[in-house]
Amino acid sequence: MLRRMNTFSGQKLAAVVKELENFAPTSWAEKWDNVGLLIEPHREKQIKKILLTNDLTEPVVKEALEKEAELIISYHPPIFKPLTRITQSHWKERVVAACLANDIALYSPHTAWDKKSGGVNDWLSKAVNIISIRPLEPELGAPPGTGSGRYIETKMELSQVVESLQKRIRNSVHVALAVGHTPKTLIQSVGICAGSGASLLKGIQADLIITGEMSHHEVLEFTHNNTTVLLCNHSNSERGFLHEFCPILAKSLNEECLVFVSEVDKDPLVTVASDINKELSAFVDVYKSTSK
């Protein structure tokens, strides 16, 4: 039987933050990042309901209010550049104002979760049959497996990776074929970076790279260096980890808090096909043209 929401005793905000730090210390985050507790309510209260989201948009704030969440954990920090004012003229300012007005705490882990062993990049890596895996840039002084990006040794046909990745992110994937690659190309090395990974992945020797987004010219640079590129859209390469983290956090809090994933958080980009049959066969058609 499902536990009734009003039976959760909750924990103090400081205790929840401590568990979040235990999972992935904010000291692991990139120096440019803005992570940790970003909004602390003026009035202390028990944290009974925790909403997880990839991006804190206005629809997500509305959802948090409707579901009476006392804490929002937003993977991307909504407060990144310093705010010079909090008015109703910009959506990010309205988001912050709503949290302050309703005593909702806000925490963001961002790149600390990326580096975590068992974090965002490892979640995305599970789309590949892993023979071996290591960080592209290990985090000094951290446990083994901690660091930026992932480099994987595998043995899979390219078409198999594409199909597996689509199932992993539960969405479509953009494919940029390397010159000379076909659907039957055996992929033996993969570079992975959730989010926007071009700068980290640049220069690595891999048959394939998987990331969320990169520019047109960055894609061309990879494909002309014999590396196929798979793009998931930025947040689609990250969001699925929230469902893995949800029970982890609940357990670490002794099941005293209700932890749930936003139902309205989604990537702003969607693929609209003018002809669904053409869309479904596009992947095969591209390969046919390259194999002639």
UniProtKB/Swiss-Prot annotation:
InterPro entries, alphabetized:
DUF34/NIF3, DUF34/NIF3_sf
According to the UniProt entry, its GO molecular function terms are: identical protein binding
All disulfide bonds of the chain are none
One CC-aspect GO term: cytoplasm
Alphabetized PANTHER family for the sequence: NGG1 INTERACTING FACTOR 3, NIF3-LIKE PROTEIN 1
> Belongs to which family?
Belongs to the GTP cyclohydrolase I type 2/NIF3 family.
What is this protein identified as? NIF3-like protein 1
The beginning of the lineage is: Eukaryota, Metazoa, Ecdysozoa, Arthropoda, Hexapoda
Give me the gene this protein comes from. anon-35F/36A
